[in-house]
């Protein structure tokens, strides 16, 4: 799925638009953005909300502050997420205080490469989530992450590959 016309023109993607929704094996999927305002670039990212029982994950793609504010205005408290994939890898153009307040994430995942050239996530963004009280996870430091979910109680553990599969040279017993 893609929100930007340029990606759609290449023919390998389907359009995503706010309001699209489906259910699969008791899990609800809902597209929250882009709407019909003609967003481009990062702000045309598909924003996907995934929910099952008391668990909700929000996957906002590369949206920036302008789209975060539009989502807060439109969805308010229904943006609350047990797990939040940090918008735009935690760049300084995203994760505004109001967005953090309304998403109220228990866990935040920063998806970025180790020593990436963009310096994602931005230290100020990490600090905002830390002050909010969210548990933070960095793919650059952890390797892939796996979230264990119980639909009745929400997210359980977030498991790091490097913690569950340490190499013999890591020096951990």
Regions found by a protein language model. Give the residues of each.
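Non-globular, low-confidence helical/coil segments that flank catalytic cores
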Residues: 1-173
């Amino acid at each position: 799925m893609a929100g930007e016309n340029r990606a759609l023109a290449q023919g390998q993607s389907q359009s995503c638009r706010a309001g699209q929704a489906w259910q699969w094996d008791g899990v609800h999927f809902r597209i929250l953005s882009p709407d019909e305002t003609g967003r481009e670039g990062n702000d045309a990212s598909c924003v996907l909300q995934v929910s099952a029982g008391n668990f909700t994950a929000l996957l906002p793609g590369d949206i920036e502050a302008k789209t975060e504010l539009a989502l807060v205005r439109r969805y308010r408290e229904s943006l609350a997420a047990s797990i939040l994939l940090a918008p735009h890898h935690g760049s300084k153009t995203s994760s505004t205080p109001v967005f953090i307040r309304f998403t109220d994430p228990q866990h935040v995942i920063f998806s970025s490469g180790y020593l990436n050239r963009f310096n994602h996530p931005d230290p100020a963004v990490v600090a905002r989530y830390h002050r909010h009280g969210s548990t933070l996870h960095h793919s650059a430091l952890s390797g892939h992450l796996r979230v264990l979910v119980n639909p009745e109680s929400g997210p359980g553990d977030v498991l790091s590959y490097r913690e569950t599969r340490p190499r013999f040279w890591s020096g951990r017993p």
